[in-house]
Amino acid sequence: MSRHHMRVRKVALLGANGLVAQRFQQRLSKHPWFELVAVYGSPRTVGMELTELQWHLPESRPDLPELVVRSLDSIISDVDDFEIVFSALPSDVAREVEKKLAAEGCYVFSNASTHTEWMLMSHW
């Protein structure tokens, strides 16, 4: 496959309403390589559409897909819906969820410092 014909990858976002999560939404909204297909959030945001959540960034809200925020409790059963996960979760929440997703074969990109010790280890 040439770089001009890359297939679009389905991605999930962990975090819905925080600044980092909204920055991810902004970056993913028009990205040519990614399609945002699922967003997972806190119990406070579960069941709400992304467009219902207060927008905190100074830039205007991007055109977002019509997605309803899902519960983190359902994420492992949803892993067939996406292959890449971007995480804006706080470290204490991210630790277990991200580890489980990686074990299920998802590529996980995290903003949390939770797995820093793993990144510092030799993997050769």
Model-identified regions with their sequence ranges:
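N-terminal Rossmann-like NAD(P) cofactor-binding subdomain of oxidoreductases
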Residues: S2-W124
